[in-house]
Structures are given as C-alpha cells and as structure tokens.
Amino acid sequence: EPVKVLDAPGIRDDYYLNLMDWSTSDQVSIALNSEVYVWDAQSSQTNRLCDVSAEGDGNWVTSVRWAENGKHLAVGLNTGAVQIWDVNHGRKVRSFSVHTRRVGVVEWNQAVVTTGSRDKRIHNHDSRARENSVISTYYAHEQEVCGLRWSPDRTQLASGGNDNLLLIWDNRYTPQESLVPSYHPEIAPVARTFRRPLFRLRDHTAAVKALAWSPTQRGLLASGGGTDDRCIRMWNTHTGQQVSCNDTKSQVCNLSWSHDGTELVSTHGYSENHIVLWKYPSMRPFGILSGHTKRVLYLAHSPDGQTVATAAGDETIRFWEVFAKSAGPPGRPGALSSSMSRLVGLPGSSAGAGKDASAAAA
C-alpha cells in the first residue's frame, strides 16, 4: 500500500502536461490549476509558492521542473510564458515569453532551461539572462511537445511529441542550422534553429510523453507510448537502434529508473490506471501497485531513490516505497526524511492511505 495519500483538488487530467516534480533538496512541487504548492519532506510543511492567475485571470500552470540545485523551480504556463522561482525566498527571479502556446514540459541542463510547447518548438534558455534568453531552438516536431529529458552526461536531449515522434538531439552535432529571425525581443539575434535531430525515431504509434535515461548505461533511453501504442521501448541513442519493445497493454504516462539501473517503474492510464515495476533488462514485471481510479499521469522520484510519488485525475497524490534505498547520484541528498509518516498535505489532504489503495504482486 502507499505510505501516504494526499488530496490534490483540481489537478488537471491532461496527458500532455507535467505537473509534479521532486527536488534534490527533498521538496515536492505540485501544480493545481493556477497555483503551485511545495511540500518539504524534512519539515513536513506545505506552502503555496505562487498563484499565476494574479498576473492574468486566465493563467494556469502547465508544467513544473526543479533545477539540479534544488533551489529553483521552472514553471510553464498555458500562455506560453515560463517563470523561474527562487523557492527558498518565495520570489520569481525570471520570466520568459517566447512560446506562442502552452508550455507542457520543462527540463534543466545546468543553467539552461529547455521548454517544449504546443507551438511545436523547443527553446533552450539561459536562465541567468534578463533578456534575449533563447540560446537555440529545436524545431522538428509536427505537433505538441510533451516529453523532454536531457541525458545524464548532458549531451543528448530526448524529445517526445503528440506526433508520435521520438527525437534525439545532440548539442555537439549541428547539421542544417539556420538563423532565427529576430522578430521577438526575447530571442537573441545570434540564436540558431536546428531542424534536423540526430535521430528521428518513428516506431511509436501514439504520443510519446514518458522518457527516462538509464542512470548507469550511457546512451540507453526508455520511452513509452500512448493509448494506441502502449509500449515501453529501449533505445541505443548512439546508433538510433531500438534495443527492445514491451507491450504493457495500457497507455504509458511516465517512466523512471532505480538508481542502480536494474529496475524501472512505469505509470499507466487507459485502461489499467496502475503502476508497474519492471526488472531490467528482462523487462519482467515484479510488482503492480493499484489504488488510483483514473490515469496515473504524473510521477516524481525521491532523491534517495526509494520512494515515488504519483498523481492522477482522481485528485490524489500517492507515495510508494518501491526501490531499495541508495545514497543517490553524486550531489544528491541521502535518505528521505522519516517525517513522511507525518505528512502535512495540501488543502483537504487525507490523514492516511485511502481505503481503495492496494498492492499486488505481478
């Protein structure tokens, strides 16, 4: 069973958004419509970071992602804007308005903020720049960009879209580049647009949101497809070759590796709405976690590698202990605070695990 269940009133049931993340400093961020909340696992305190509707009645949050330093949070909006927040001081330090449609996914690569949008573009921003923030643009998706992940060595970016495409971009490889027209004040005249990725992988037959790089095997990427695909595929991103394909029988919403790279967790939507634990490389399922009653659209992994948080359209957040505890990658804190058992929730949070929560071995 989950170690805790919280209410998440009003969380959006939208496959293309990314509304929850867990920082290296042990804080969970969750976006509920126009508001972003942060729960601190060390103190068990929950605070509202911001309400973006204060800047416009129709504004709401479409994505959140922590920087690697655990201090700054990138927040994407339905308007196409991206905000950078200093969470410790509760203040907005940057705002970029380059995209013309909603920003459904945000990713960090050190000081670079990478944003993906329904306008089909991926922008790389210098988070330190007060203006002309865009360093480069990747423009090859044909529909909304809903998945972004930089590789652990920071050289390759995997992007997934509603066009069923999985693209691999390499920041050391720059074919067919052209200058970006400087029609927008936020885009530097020297920024470049790249239209040809290193690899254009077309095997998925539905939207590609779920992306996860192996923490131990360089160039190994896991990707998951939507309702008409349902497959977890493994890729060698040095060659562009598919390593394996596993039909999960259900929409794949998220993927995350154990810290030692020997296990994988996936969350699912139509039709199972459950969480599956897999052995790698056999891709043999060894656990199924049930309890959510709608699509498990959002997943976040604790810094110690042991716990995952899942959020769904059923307006609950569930915390599960799924992997062996580890010291974590370099620069990450160790064990999750025992204060998890005294979790102080968002408004209307449950006191304990819901009655509908259950766990069963595969």
Functional labels for PLM-detected ranges:
Residues 9-14, 53-61, 97-103, 138-145, ...:
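WD40/WD-repeat beta-propeller blade N-cap
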Residues 19-25, 64-70, 76, 106-112, ...:
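Loop/turn segments within WD40 beta-propeller blades
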Residues 1-19, 26, 318, 362:
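Acidic and/or Ser/Thr-rich intrinsically disordered tails and linkers
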Residues 1, 249-251, 271-273, 282-362:
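Terminal intrinsically disordered, low-complexity extensions flanking WD-repeat/beta-propeller proteins
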Residues 4-9, 45-54, 91-96, 133-138, ...:
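A short beta-strand motif characteristic of beta-propeller blades
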Residues 36-40, 82-86, 106, 122-126, ...:
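WD40-repeat beta-propellers
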Residues 31-33, 76-79, 116-119, 159-163, ...:
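Conserved strand-to-loop turn within each blade of WD40 beta-propeller repeats
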Residues 16, 60, 69, 102, ...:
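WD40/WD-repeat beta-propeller blade-loop signature
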